[in-house]
Amino acid sequence: MAAQVSEKLQDLHLNGLNGDAKSNATVIGQTEAGEAEDDSDDEKEDGNTAPEAGAGGGAYLHVWVIFEMPVSQALGMLAYNSRIPAAKKKKRKSKKKKKGGAKVQSSPPRVPVSNLFPNNQYPEGEIVEYKNENSYRTTNEEKRYLDRMNNNFLQEYRQAAEVHRQVRQYAQKTIKPGQTLTEIAEGIEDAVRALTGHQGLEEGDNLKGGMGFPCGLSINHCAAHYTPNAGNKMVLQQGDVMKVDFGAHINGRIVDSAFTMTFDPVYDPLLEAVKDATNTGIREAGIDVRMSDIGAAIQEAMESYEVELNGTMYPVKCIRNLNGHNIDRHIIHGGKSVPIVKGSDQTKMEEGETFAIETFGSTGKGYVREDMETSHYALIPDAPSVPLRLSSAKNLLNVINKNFGTLPFCRRYLDRLGQEKYLLGLNNLVSSGIVQDYPPLCDVKGSYTAQFEHTILLRPTVKEVISRGDDY
């Protein structure tokens, strides 16, 4: 019996113990001195294997009980001990690697939307089926095939639209009275550049993506085409009605959308009138629809509203000399106009075209004129070749061609590129018919104007309101 016990003890490799139960009790639940902890996750656990020396405290506890009992009991204990599972080794939890790319937008917006949608599949806009004689397009196989062929075209538009939505929703939350217009405009423009991934400081970069045109911040009676020039100190006031109109583009696919901000609920009926008119225009637009029919529907919706200001009721009037327009690649104003009043234009919308449906309402005369300092400019597509005598004009034209092409720009954009003393050359390009200037457009002073706008795509099968969002 004693020999059997001795053999069992040798099998357990206990010859390193000193025989003092008290001194060895400290090793219960510990590894032997000098034995490193094993973090391998691959080692198999075997429930039928006796614990190795130093593998854990269980073996030591049973061993020291053996020296205090008769041999028969000791052998029984050894038999029991052989069935105890080996002490579990401490496993180190492996840290999961974080996947690259942010999953949410930052505040202020600075994460490119391509990081948020790594598969380059961007949310589609509002899908509206065609009606009347075009209702067949939704299920027509030939049209569906044509629609599938345009996937890259659609994804570029949808990416630009997602940029616009994220930037404007941040702007709506953060713009407050007391901010300068320069601060507001640059905040929006910086966000668009960051989210498209194109800062526009290197030659040609702005042609790949970024601002589709300068951020317009037209106040009160000014309806359109106002953005601050360098040195502008104008501050947004509590009683102001501000139109925020900006574009984002990817590879020249421009998404043009605008909204109006107020900080006094007295202007709500004015905003409701214009929003209703814009949505009416979107609803009526479609393949083979005549422009005159769209304008008549818009006017009827707009002019059914009135607004009370300081105890006086004002009818909301369409600004009759402002229009929506089609959008071509890298060209914000194509050759077609979408009127917002009844007229005789028999031009039709066509399959594959992109339109900016925008409406303007006013408490004034409903007619705008050029006023105030010009800030918006654009190279005229296919402008005739004209000899330029001013070297400053030649140099500036080169800068415009390489950085903007036919995309609109403003003076602040030239400042940002490091251009200096360019005004004389810029005016020479305008007078030569190479560059078009776009002065601010204003109704009578004391009146209030509002604007809402969306970009729509006339796809072969459906109409997609590409810039639609939860906000408007």
From Swiss-Prot:
Cofactor: binding details: Binds 2 divalent metal cations per subunit. Has a high-affinity and a low affinity metal-binding site. The true nature of the physiological cofactor is under debate. The enzyme is active with cobalt, zinc, manganese or divalent iron ions. Most likely, methionine aminopeptidases function as mononuclear Fe(2+)-metalloproteases under physiological conditions, and the catalytically relevant metal-binding site has been assigned to the histidine-containing high-affinity site.
Localisation: Cytoplasm
A single MF term (Gene Ontology): metal ion binding
Amino-acid positions noted as binding a divalent metal cation 2 in the UniProt annotation, renumbered to this chain: D256, H325, E358, E453
Ranges annotated as biased composition (Acidic residues): 34-45
Repeat in keyword set: no
Domain of life: Eukaryota
Start and end residues of each stretch annotated as Disordered: 14-53, 86-119
Catalysed reaction, written as an equation: Release of N-terminal amino acids, preferentially methionine, from peptides and arylamides
E.C. designation(s): 3.4.11.18
Pfam families: Peptidase_M24
Biased composition (Basic residues): 86-101
Binding-site residues for a divalent metal cation 1, renumbered to this chain: D245, D256, E453
Record's keyword terms, sorted: Aminopeptidase, Cytoplasm, Hydrolase, Metal-binding, Protease
One term under GO cellular component: cytoplasm
GO biological process: proteolysis
Assigned protein family: Belongs to the peptidase M24A family. Methionine aminopeptidase eukaryotic type 2 subfamily.
Entry-linked HAMAP family: MetAP_2_euk (MF_03175)
Protein name, entry field: Methionine aminopeptidase 2-3
Lineage of the organism: Eukaryota, Fungi, Dikarya, Ascomycota, Pezizomycotina
